[in-house]
C-alpha cells in the first residue's frame, strides 16, 4: 500500500483560489461582451412610430395612408427573404417573426431629397415592437431602401 503525503502551502492555496476566481469571473463576464441584439424599438402607438421616423430625419404625414394586417409565411423565401435581408442590414428582427401576424403602417414621406412626392415609409410592427421597415418610391422607376435618411451629396 502506498501513502502519499503532501503539505498545502498558504501561498500556493491562495494562488490557486485566485486563479479559480479569475477563471470563474471570465466565464461569467465574457458572454456579456458578445454583441447583443438591439433593444426593441417601441412602435405601438402613432406617436411612437412618428417619433421614430422623425428621429431618422423623415418628415411624414401624421396619419398612415394604409394599415394592413399580414400573416408572414413560416419560411421567408424569395421576396420575403430579400426583405428580411434588408431588415437585417438595419438590425431589425423581421426574420424572427416569421409565421406571425404583423401590422404594416404606411406613411407618406414629404421630404425625400429630390423627390417631392410618391415616396412612402412602411413600418412593420408586432405587438408594440418595430420589427421592420423600408422607404419606397411609387414612381415608374421606383426603389425600395432602408429607413436610413439618404446622405446629401455636397458639391
Language-model region placement:
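Mature extracytoplasmic domains of secretory-pathway proteins
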Residues: 58-116
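Hydrophobic membrane-insertion alpha-helices, especially the h-region
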Residues: 14-27
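Short, small/polar residue-rich loop motifs at catalytic or cofactor-binding pockets
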Residues: 10, 116-119
Amino acid at each position: 500500500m502506498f501513502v502519499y503525503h503532501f503539505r498545502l502551502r498558504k501561498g500556493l492555496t491562495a494562488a490557486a483560489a485566485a486563479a479559480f476566481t479569475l477563471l470563474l469571473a471570465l466565464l461569467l463576464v465574457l458572454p456579456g461582451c458578445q454583441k447583443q441584439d438591439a433593444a426593441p424599438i417601441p412602435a405601438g402607438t402613432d406617436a411612437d412610430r412618428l417619433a421614430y421616423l422623425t428621429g431618422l430625419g423623415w418628415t411624414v404625414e401624421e396619419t398612415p395612408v394604409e394599415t394592413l394586417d399580414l400573416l408572414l409565411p413560416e419560411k421567408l423565401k424569395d421576396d420575403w427573404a430579400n426583405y428580411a435581408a434588408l431588415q437585417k442590414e438595419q438590425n431589425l428582427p423581421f426574420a424572427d417573426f416569421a409565421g406571425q401576424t404583423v401590422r404594416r403602417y404606411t406613411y407618406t414621406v414629404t421630404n425625400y431629397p429630390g423627390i417631392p412626392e410618391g415616396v412612402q415609409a412602411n413600418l412593420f410592427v408586432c405587438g408594440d415592437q418595430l420589427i421592420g421597415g423600408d422607404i419606397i418610391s411609387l414612381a415608374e422607376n421606383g426603389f425600395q431602401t432602408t429607413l436610413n435618411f439618404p446622405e446629401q451629396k455636397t458639391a
